[in-house]
């Protein structure tokens, strides 16, 4: 070590004569590194597993104790409590006057029933009006036949006039008929392809 210090002193003196900068260095002997303390224990994995399992069990124990303190209900207990609550509410509400919500719900049911009966009555009224319309059309056909027979026209003209179904009246009352009911629901009348001039000539002959 004394020789090293002498070398360092000499170098420092020479450098000091050249400039103000001093440069010194020393050598240290590094001994062999031993890894004996860093070696893993033979049962370190087993010890770590059991320690982790113990920590997990303790943690779950605290979690379960907190859940039981908050009072999380079980399903069986919840169903029995709901049944008891329903029975108690029924018994308590049996003697009380009706609440406004229940009254409104019953009024809504009654209104829906009245609307349904009104709809049925309207349908029956429409059916009756259609039946009356058909009977009046038949009566008008019979009256037309009698008038033509009394006038003495031939049977061909009678048959020709019978093809046309002309209603005697049109009811425009909107209370009984809708817009679709005013339309004639009978099939369209297909006229013969013969022109009227030929038929008139045949009648004259």
Curated annotation (Swiss-Prot):
The record's section on InterPro entries has:
MRAP
Q: Which residues are tagged as glycosylated in the record?
A: 9
As for subcellular location, the record says: Cell membrane; Endoplasmic reticulum membrane
- Major location category of this protein: membrane
Effect annotated for changing residue 88 to Y: Found in a patient with obesity; uncertain significance
**GO CC terms on record?**
endoplasmic reticulum; endoplasmic reticulum membrane; plasma membrane
Question: Pfam families of this UniProt entry?
Answer: MRAP
Q: Which GO terms describe its biological process?
A: energy homeostasis; energy reserve metabolic process; feeding behavior; negative regulation of adenylate cyclase-activating G protein-coupled receptor signaling pathway; negative regulation of protein localization to plasma membrane; positive regulation of adenylate cyclase-activating G protein-coupled receptor signaling pathway; protein localization to plasma membrane; regulation of adenylate cyclase-activating G protein-coupled receptor signaling pathway
Q: Which GO terms describe its molecular function?
A: corticotropin hormone receptor binding; identical protein binding; signaling receptor regulator activity; type 1 melanocortin receptor binding; type 3 melanocortin receptor binding; type 4 melanocortin receptor binding; type 5 melanocortin receptor binding
- Positions modified as Phosphoserine? 89
Instruction: Describe, from its UniProt entry, the tissues in which this protein is expressed.
Output: Expressed in the adrenal gland and brain. Not expressed in other tissues.
Q: Has keyword Cell membrane? A: yes
Top-level taxon: Eukaryota
Transmembrane region(s): 45-65
Give the way it sits in the membrane: Single-pass membrane protein
- List the keywords (alphabetical): Cell membrane, Endoplasmic reticulum, Glycoprotein, Membrane, Obesity, Phosphoprotein, Transmembrane, Transmembrane helix
Q: Which disease is it linked to?
A: Obesity: A condition characterized by an increase of body weight beyond the limitation of skeletal and physical requirements, as the result of excessive accumulation of body fat.
The UniProt entry's sequence similarity note says: Belongs to the MRAP family.
Q: How does it assemble?
A: Homodimer and heterodimer. Forms antiparallel homodimers and heterodimers with MRAP. Interacts with MC1R, MC2R, MC3R, MC4R and MC5R.
Q: Its function? A: Modulator of melanocortin receptor 4 (MC4R), a receptor involved in energy homeostasis. Plays a central role in the control of energy homeostasis and body weight regulation by increasing ligand-sensitivity of MC4R and MC4R-mediated generation of cAMP. May also act as a negative regulator of MC2R: competes with MRAP for binding to MC2R and impairs the binding of corticotropin (ACTH) to MC2R. May also regulate activity of other melanocortin receptors (MC1R, MC3R and MC5R); however, additional evidence is required in vivo.
Q: What is this protein called?
A: Melanocortin-2 receptor accessory protein 2
């Amino acid at each position: 070590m004394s020789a090293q210090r002498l070398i360092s002193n000499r170098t420092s003196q020479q450098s000091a004569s050249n400039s103000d900068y001093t440069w010194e260095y020393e050598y240290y002997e590094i001994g062999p590194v031993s890894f004996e303390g860093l070696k893993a224990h033979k049962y370190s994995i087993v010890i770590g597993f059991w320690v982790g399992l113990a920590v997990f069990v303790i943690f779950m124990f605290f979690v379960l104790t907190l859940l039981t303190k908050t009072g999380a209900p079980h399903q069986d207990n919840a169903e029995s409590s709901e049944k008891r609550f329903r029975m108690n509410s029924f018994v308590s509400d049996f003697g009380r006057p009706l609440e406004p919500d229940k009254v409104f719900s019953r009024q809504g049911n009654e209104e829906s029933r009245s609307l349904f009966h009104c709809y049925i009555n309207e349908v029956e009224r429409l059916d009756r009006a259609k039946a009356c319309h058909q009977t009046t059309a038949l009566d008008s056909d019979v009256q037309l036949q009698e008038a033509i027979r009394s006038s003495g026209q031939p049977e061909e003209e009678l048959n020709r006039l019978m093809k046309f179904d002309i209603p005697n009246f049109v009811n425009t009352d909107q209370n009984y008929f809708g817009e679709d009911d005013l339309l004639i629901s009978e099939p369209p009348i297909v006229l013969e392809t013969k022109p009227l001039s030929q038929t008139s000539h045949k009648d004259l002959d």
